[in-house]
């Protein structure tokens, strides 16, 4: 789901960075308020776990790929703002060091996989936290919401075309991106994300229940 350089127009790049910059600033402010010596090791560990699982990409139709995120687990434990910033840092390192995702698309990738994933997961978990399926559903919705943002932005890129109608950037429209990305995440990648989140949450709960609920302390 990492969008590389060259897939989105300059106008899209500028717009996504304009949206992301104040959100990053707010997230950094929340991080400074909530991070302490006790929670830092867990945040670092979960961010590293997210980094690792996102490196395993599975190609899907429509010119992109799918993978697990780990952002739902971060959002449940630390809240959506800290989770969004943590995933943004992970995405930046992946783009800069491994070329997984473009620098021009970094803001869009962060908005999709970081902010959309974290806030959708946090919302679902908080609304259904008394239900035993809340953690799974939080993981599932984080993947689906992220894929929808990516599919939507990529799907409108063909509107930017030369006079003969040939797209200048990403060539597939919404009729391809929505079913390819959102559909695959609803039936497969989201389920994988939900299972991963549920298992990881259960492991953390057994190891250190206090640390697991750090954001509620």
Regions found by a protein language model. Give the residues of each.
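Hydrophobic transmembrane alpha-helices
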Residues: 2-10, 14-16, 20-73
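Hydrophobic alpha-helical transmembrane segments
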Residues: 14-15, 40-45, 84-88, 111, ...
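Small-polar-interrupted transmembrane alpha-helices in polytopic inner-membrane proteins
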Residues: 47-51, 82-95
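Interfacial aromatic-anchored transmembrane helix boundaries in multi-pass membrane proteins
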Residues: 58-62, 89-120
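Transmembrane helix-bundle signature of multi-pass membrane transporters/permeases
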Residues: 84, 91-92, 110, 115, ...
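Short helix-perturbing small/polar motifs within transmembrane alpha-helices
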Residues: 112-151
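C-terminal transmembrane helix-loop-helix hairpin of multi-pass membrane proteins
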Residues: 137-140, 166-217
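Juxtamembrane non-transmembrane "cap" segments at the membrane-aqueous interface
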Residues: 144-168
